[in-house]
UniProtKB/Swiss-Prot annotation:
Gene that encodes it: rpoC
Similarity-based family: Belongs to the RNA polymerase beta' chain family.
Entry-linked PANTHER family: DNA-DIRECTED RNA POLYMERASE, DNA-DIRECTED RNA POLYMERASE SUBUNIT BETA
EC code: 2.7.7.6
Cofactor: Mg(2+); Zn(2+)
Residues involved in Zn(2+) 1 binding: 60, 62, 75, 78
Positions with a binding annotation for Zn(2+) 2: 818, 892, 899, 902
Pfam families: RNA_pol_Rpb1_1, RNA_pol_Rpb1_2, RNA_pol_Rpb1_3, RNA_pol_Rpb1_4, RNA_pol_Rpb1_5
Annotated positions binding Mg(2+): 449, 451, 453
CDD domains to which the protein is assigned, alphabetical: RNAP_beta'_C, RNAP_beta'_N
Subunit structure: The RNAP catalytic core consists of 2 alpha, 1 beta, 1 beta' and 1 omega subunit. When a sigma factor is associated with the core the holoenzyme is formed, which can initiate transcription.
Name of the protein in its database record: DNA-directed RNA polymerase subunit beta'
Amino acid sequence: MIDVNKFESMQIGLASPDKIRSWSYGEVKKPETINYRTLKPEKQGLFDERIFGPTKDYECACGKYKRIRYKGRVCDRCGVEVTSAKVRRERMGHIELAAPVSHIWYFKGIPSRMGLVLDMSPRSLEEVIYFASYVVLDPGDTPLEKKQLLTEAEYRDKKAEYGDRFKAEMGAAAIQKLLADVDLEKEAAELKEELKEATGQKRTRAIRRLDILEAFIKSGNKPEWMVMDVIPVMPPDLRPMVQLEGGRFATSDLNDLYRRVINRNNRLKRLLKLQAPGIIVQNEKRMLQEAVDALIDNGRRGRPVAGPGNRPLKSLSHLLKGKQGRFRQNLLGKRVDYSGRSVIDVGPSLKLNQMGLPVPMALELFKPFIMHELVKRGLSANVKSAKRKIDRSDDDVFDVLEDVIKEHPVLLNRAPTLHRLGIQAFEPILVSGKSMRLHPLVCSAYNADFDGDQMAIHVPLSDEAQAEARLLMLAAHHILSPRDGEPIVSPSQDMVIGNYYMTTEDKGREGEGMIFKDTDEAELAYRNDYVSLQTRVGVQVSAFPEKPFTDDQRGKIMVTTVGKLLFNRIMPKDFAYINEPTDANIQNGVDDRFFLEPGQDIHEYLENAPLVPPFKKGFLSDLIAEVYKRYKVTKTSQFLDRIKDLGYYESTISGLTTAMSDIHDLPEKPEILDKAQKQVTLITKQFRRGLITDDERYERVIGAWNDAKDEVQNKLIEHMDIHNPINMMSDSGARGNISNFTQLAGMRGLMASPNGKIMELPVKSNFYEGLSVLEMFISSHGARKGMTDTALKTANSGYLTRRLVDVAQDVVVREKDCGTDRGLEVTAITNGNEMIEPLYDRIMGRYTMKSVFDPKTGEKIVGKNVLIDEEMAQKIVDAGVKKVTIRSAFTCNTEHGVCERCYGRNAATGDRVEAGEAVGTVAAQSIGEPGTQLTLRNFHTGGVAGNDDITQGLPRIQEIVEARNPKGRATITEVTGEVVSIEENPAERTKDITIKGETDTRTYTLPITARMKVAEGDFIHRGAPLNEGSIDPKELIQVRDVLSTETYLLSQVQGVYRMQGIDLLDKHVEIMIRQMMRKVRVMDPGDTDLLPGQLMDISQFRDANKDTLVAGNIPATARPVILGITKAALETNSFLSAASFQETTRVLTDAAIRGKNDPLVGLKENVIIGKIIPAGTGMSAYRNIKPKEVSVAAYSIKDIEAKLKEEDKQN
């Protein structure tokens, strides 16, 4: 076997007949499979042992030679080689066809490859191949033309007229001869000449033909190989026949298809031998052609061949295609051993890097390790008895188990794995029961809850795998989300409400104004009921020597609460004392207003002091981010565990409950509803009098009811008591929000009808009062729509993620610095007056391209090529800088990836990104993962005339990344200049906008309903939109340059995500958009070998031009092209990656003709061939690092399996 990690690339091509024969171990001559009595394979049949190898390991068919010592001997009686039965998975056979047969992929594909080579239409080809017409092969001296088609009758007439002076044949044999006659070089040269003057349809066809002829010339494939004389037979173990209970057999469809081919082939041979009449032979040849077509791609032409129960048979093509095909089912995703799955349960007592593993699962997963340990300790004599001990659950086993799993990390995965945090490593802790325990804080990363979710567990076996799991994948390392760099492990639900309850302040509680020496004394008072957690007290600052107080503050008394004193105990020792939930408190310590002046009375101070709000969920998250920034992984994970324990403990102590009595009536509600009803009546009256249109009426009615609902909500908030448990729940961020409360105590408001439009009939009741039957019915539409939307959204979003991953999977950080001299100028992204993404978010964690200067003083804030951290970013924003030029993936020069400088900081660690980081996949996951949170609907801005529906949410993202023509398209100007006039033309319902540029004047016609973005007298730059709507990037790239198109797309994607409250870093979107812009289309090939109209990588184009320029010739010109992600993924340089993505047969057909070479650069193609992926520790730079041998060599699982086999043989 070749070592899969050694070879560099993989090539695909057309197989010549000789090649197919050289692969084969023998010809399959009979359609038989196995003998019905002996169940042994039949000789010369589809399962013949002489061709494909023995069915039993090291045993020939007749049983003369058994055992491994005869390995390699061919039995003189039955002719079977004595070898491992595994060879039946790799040895191929062949069938010698009695007549040539065309390969359906090359004849039927779009465009038909045979048709292009021969310059014949697919229809003519079909007529010839399936024996409907003759084709002239050699016209001789007759007036016929080569490749002319003749019907049966015409052929007979011509034969009578000219005799043997011309040659015409039918069937694949004729096509084979025509293909063999093609002089590729000559045809290509003629086409190149023709291209110089050809235009339109003719030119397109010429380019396509030239492309395919060049492919044949360059690859060395011969066109006649598209017609086959021999077909290979797949190894039998890949198309097995198995006995079911009840004596019946189940077989792969391929055996049926091969059988039909063999039957027809044998019949044809017999007919030819008998010299049967031409028409019978022709018919048999056609049937053979159809049988081979069905074998290769059943259903591609005509009706598919059906098996029992009218089910179409699965052909060779179907084995590769689709989710269940070879690529996606077996090569990209395999089932692995040493894995299990179970229901998950909450493990509140676990540490962040632990998980609870049920004992029965541990016994099974770590079996070989336990057996090794039992033998090593002398508790079992050999591996076999150790195995018996485990099966008996002997006491010795449990003594060993603890030690075996200690320090052996396991991986936990929850499907769907939407981002890389869907698989994390934990240290197992044994637990009783059958469910696995999961740490509550990692639930948000997995999107897990404990209502019956299941998770899968995997055991990394090798030392390297364990080391990687521990160092790179341990849950404690995954505190920040790679999507936006914010903490993803933040407390939720009980933990939040516990910490909220404990940091609440209250006026006039028992013991208010007591002054304590330190936290311990305050705790003592609390435990003895002198004070409550919410009591405001004083404490001497001198009790906190390590905390960063100012010298002035150190001698004073600080006002805080008992709960906050206890909360600050869990903070790192030298972290600021947290007394109020503000950023200033975290950064600069406690504000001076919380300190008593010497001699000041604390009771007097408390009379006037306002209550400080408690710590909510968002603040806890900020706190975690700051702790992580300062102390990194270990301290943060300990802090997280303390926050979790404290939260759970305090929420238990608090005894918070909710009941009907917590919901109060709203006395003002009838009055508010009455007012709204009157308004609606008035609006209806206006409509009846014709003062407003129906659309306006609808808008206003909806508005009136929405205002009423908002008013009810505001009144509710006014009446709300801070101690109301429902209020505490929503205010702290533990669960629910104000709108839930409005529906309980206020009114439900307007509902959506099944068609997505809002109904004018509001639900006036709330759940506390109860809904009427009609109201209940109206509400049910919305609920049902919500469920179906979610289901559809999941599928759409999953497919989007798959396409994104596919297009970006080969983007890896490959070098430190690409040395580019271009950068990206960034400003805050706004939409009108609305801020979409502030400058701070755009520059933080990026490298500067140019130095940044203060616009007022002119002093340098940040130099060039510096990584901007939070502090610098804040400085830049505070100085009033509006534009910063940063390094960006858009302008990075690294091939097949990006460099560290252009990428910037790794969001998941907060440090510089390291070479080998698979940033493309991370980017795709970061964009795809929140896809399910995006809305599925287009936002209806309502029916007001001219306000076209603007696509939002998931459909808009798909529109952008697939580079489709957007809905509600904006017209852009192609000239820079002044808007001279905007004239309305009511008769044709249009507006004409005239723009006068320096050299020319353009007039654009828009519909009268369009909402203008420009006014007369405005000066606008080319590429600017004239009306509201989305710009088509394909137009923009022609009018402006690539960078401005990329910037536009980036701002659009960010607009959609930020509208939904989802933060997403620019760099992820940049990587995806860069992948869409990798190609150029050659316009004029100059003196290069390129073809006009050819799509190619920018880097390849540059290389071709470089060589031409060095030789002193004319370079080619090309224009940039924007491809949708599906198209971009299919256009990748790797045929393996493209074939495993979509349109498998088309990709492989094309790759084979071109003799494509897959350089194995991306991750996917390496996974497919089983090579270690070239990212992370798999990069060549890291691959050659050898660890020092220190301890005894570790045993492997293979050793144990071998031992077991040995012991079996001895027994």
